[in-house]
From Swiss-Prot:
Organism: Rickettsia prowazekii (strain Madrid E)
Single Gene Ontology MF annotation: DNA binding
Gene: xerD
Protein name (database record): Tyrosine recombinase XerD
Sorted UniProt keywords: Cell cycle, Cell division, Chromosome partition, Cytoplasm, DNA integration, DNA recombination, DNA-binding
Domain spans labelled Core-binding (CB): 1-83
Highest taxon listed in the record's lineage: Bacteria
Description of how the protein assembles with itself and partners: Forms a cyclic heterotetrameric complex composed of two molecules of XerC and two molecules of XerD.
Annotated compartments: Cytoplasm
Entry similarity comment: Belongs to the 'phage' integrase family. XerD subfamily.
Length: 311
């Protein structure tokens, strides 16, 4: 545990990773150590063969290849750290090939389904409904990560640090790895936020919070609505609108934002910047979605063999 604590401190100090990323590293490392303990293997006397057995163990527990790859990468980084600190001279993961897997195309909502959600939320004039309407409009208009959305501060989106400020249509957020990027939102999102700001005090009073810096304050430990709570609210909207709750989540709204931009003719590099992807290959998944969309559209072409027969 001592080495793990040192490694996590290094990640926090040098790589500026988010709390969620640090927790993910910690879980992977603790799971790995539990495995080693069960096998009576010392982490400082481990072999590449031991690592291969561990990977086989993970696969036998039906862990997805993507998750196995993440765990392997975590352990590889951990041993690189141990070497740099002179705790060991050997990285047993160095020559391990990552399992191959097929990228699944992300689920997206159609534009009509998005409209259905927004229309439903716009009719709920309770404080909770007005807040949810603002959050969904903002998420779909911007493609923010859910962690970025819920932790927005008044100063991020308003011209001054009070709820009386003007809502910016263009503002900046700090994304993964503390990388700043520009966010642009539409008029509908702006109007929904303005309406929400009129009743925001309801949530401040409800939370009995003295921390007024967050756009969406709550009684949660962090001072703002949790990602989990927002996801639950989205599921309830799906049920009320007749949509599959499994197909309505913050991340699916982000996917839908990107896919709809591409369908509308936006440049892939622009979408990459808006999403905050470090690598364009991550964004290219949406081109496959767009291709599938075009293929389905072509099924309705009059010369398609399934719908039109030449005499």
């Amino acid at each position: 545990m001592e080495f793990i604590a040192q490694f996590l401190e290094m990640l926090l100090a040098e790589r500026a990773l988010s709390k969620n990323s640090i927790l993910s590293y910690k879980r992977d490392l603790l799971d790995f150590q539990h495995y080693l303990a069960a096998q009576k293997i010392s982490e400082l006397n481990i072999t590449t063969g031991n690592i291969r057995k561990w990977i086989e163990y993970l696969a036998s527990n039906n862990l997805h290849a993507r998750s196995i790859n993440r765990k392997i990468s975590t352990i590889k980084s951990y041993y690189a750290f141990l070497i740099s600190e002179n705790h060991t001279k050997f990285n047993p993961v160095l020559n391990i090939d990552l399992p191959k897997y097929q990228n699944k195309l992300p689920i997206i909502l159609s534009i009509d389904q998005i409209k259905l959600i927004l229309e439903y939320c716009s009719k709920d004039n309770t404080p909770e409904g007005i807040r949810l309407n603002a959050m969904i409009n903002l998420l779909y208009a911007s493609g923010l990560r859910v962690s970025e959305l819920v932790s927005l501060k008044l100063a991020d989106i308003l011209t001054n640090n009070t709820s009386k400020g003007t809502v910016r249509k263009i503002f900046s957020v700090l994304g993964k790895g503390n990388k700043e990027r520009v966010i642009v939102i539409n008029d509908q999102a702006v109007l929904s936020i303005i309406k929400y700001l009129e009743i925001r005090d309801f949530f401040i009073n409800k939370a009995k919070s003295k921390n007024l810096i967050y756009l969406f304050p709550s009684s949660a430990v962090a001072g703002y609505m949790t990602r989990q709570n927002f996801a639950i609210l989205l599921k309830s909207v799906a049920l009320y609108t007749g949509l599959n709750p499994e197909h309505v989540s913050p991340h699916i709204l982000r996917h839908s934002f990107a896919s709809h931009l591409l369908e509308g003719g936006a440049d892939l590099r622009v979408i990459q910047e808006l999403l905050g992807h470090a690598d364009i290959s991550t964004t290219q998944i949406y081109t496959h979605l767009h291709t599938n969309h075009l293929k389905k559209a072509l099924l309705h072409h009059p010369l398609n063999k399934n719908s039109f027969i030449l005499s």
